[in-house]
A protein has these predicted regions:
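Enriched for extracellular/lumenal, surface-exposed ectodomains of secreted and cell-surface proteins
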Residues: 43-44, 57-59, 73, 86-97, ...
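Terminal connector regions
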Residues: 1, 74-111, 181-194
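Asparagine-centered strand-capping/turn motif at beta-strand->loop junctions
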Residues: 27-31, 132-137
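Short, solvent-exposed loop/linker segments at beta-strand-coil boundaries, enriched for Pro/Gly
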Residues: 44-50, 109-111, 150-156
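Short, solvent-exposed loop/linker segments at the N-terminal edge
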Residues: 13-19, 119-125
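Hydrophobic core residues within well-ordered beta-strands of beta-rich domains
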Residues: 21, 67, 85, 127-129, ...
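Short acidic/proline- and small/hydrophobic-mixed sequence motifs that coincide with surface turns
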Residues: 20, 32-38, 99, 126, ...
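Intrinsically disordered, low-complexity Pro/Gly/Ser/Thr-rich segments with frequent PxxP/GP/PP motifs
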Residues: 50-79, 156-186
């Protein structure tokens, strides 16, 4: 079939949690006619990224040719190691063609995981909850605050948020500052998010 066919031809992009960066994306016209007045729009439903200039006018792309577009972005410090930013690149031209590409991004950052916990967790109990957390990411974690959140009327939290000043990659930290209450309405064996 004759016509233009524009798609992203660059590979996986790299980003660091908590930093500004430019995503350089190469577009290639795989078709056999000129793609006229090409527009490229980068989008994401993620709350962990801010797109500063999401729509870029590319102009014309000849058959077999490349054009590079640069999207300035900020990846928030809340983005963790290998976070899926769910980026999508929508390319359109003057002829009404539209092409949609998934944009893969490797995010470098901390990744805080619960390694272990201790405390009496049963319906109707109030307990001092102890957490062992490990940074399993690719970057140190610094100046974070950790807060356990209540769940419906089933889990109550009686403690203030805890601050973490620094946690290097592979390091653990024990936190024993959490007072938690569990409703007597909880059924044994229930799984509750926290």
């Amino acid at each position: 079939a004759a016509g233009s066919a524009v798609a992203m031809s660059s590979g996986t992009l790299e980003a660091i949690s908590g930093e500004e960066t430019d995503f350089e994306i190469t577009l290639h016209n795989f078709g056999n006619t000129i793609a006229s007045d090409v527009m490229a729009e980068l989008s994401s439903p993620s709350g962990h990224i801010t797109l500063h200039d999401a729509m870029i006018s590319v102009g014309d792309i000849n058959p077999g040719s490349d054009e590079t577009v640069v999207f300035p972005v900020y990846v928030h410090g809340t983005a963790f190691y290998m976070e899926d930013l769910d980026l999508k690149l929508t390319i359109s031209d003057a002829e009404g063609n539209t092409w949609v590409n998934a944009v893969p991004v490797n995010v470098e950052g901390p990744y805080l995981m619960v390694d272990d916990y201790a405390g009496d967790i049963y319906p109707g109990s109030n307990t001092e909850f102890i957490l062992n957390l490990e940074n399993q990411g690719s970057r140190s974690l610094s100046s974070y605050s950790l807060e356990l959140l209540p769940y419906d009327n089933l889990v109550s939290i009686y403690s203030d948020p805890t601050s973490l000043s620094e946690l290097s990659v592979g390091e653990n930290i024990y936190l024993d500052d959490f007072e938690i209450g569990f409703s007597s309405d909880i059924i044994n064996g229930s799984v509750l998010p926290m």
